[in-house]
Amino acid sequence: MQNPSKAEIKEILQRSKRIAVVGLSDRPDRTSHMVSKAMQDAGYEIIPVNPTIDEALGVKAVSSLKEIDGPIDIVNVFRRSEQLPGVAEEFLETDAPVFWAQQGLVNEEAYQMLKEKGRTVIMDLCIKVAHAVTK
């Protein structure tokens, strides 16, 4: 498994506008909330994807990626590593080009599934940190 280069990640972040966040919590003390808030503050549109909440960051939550209207640039995932193949399968039903699993999340099965379909895959990297170091 290999992530795109720092230059490629910078380009992905520069061209992207909408980030669907799978597993986004409505609790401000959760990492998913803090990272997504930072990305929202940086100008990205955040779409919460979590069937157990009504909204997060002032945005109505959807229960699955399939419920999102319009294009998705990045799907940022805050789920356990063993759940990544299931998220990847749902991701492949969208037109989103980039699957981004947060720091500490790696799953070789999901990685191979997505690469075989020509999608960009980033794993084990915090999107907030990547955004900060590639500005």
Swiss-Prot record:
Domain of life: Bacteria
Alphabetical list of InterPro entries matching this protein: CoA-bd, NAD(P)-bd_dom_sf
GO cellular component: cytoplasm; cytosol
Coiled coil location: none
Pfam families: CoA_binding_2
Alphabetized SUPFAM superfamilies for the sequence: NAD(P)-binding Rossmann-fold domains
PANTHER family: COA-BINDING DOMAIN-CONTAINING PROTEIN, CYTOPLASMIC PROTEIN-RELATED
Protein name per the record: Uncharacterized protein YneT
Organism listed in the record: Bacillus subtilis (strain 168)
Protein's gene: yneT
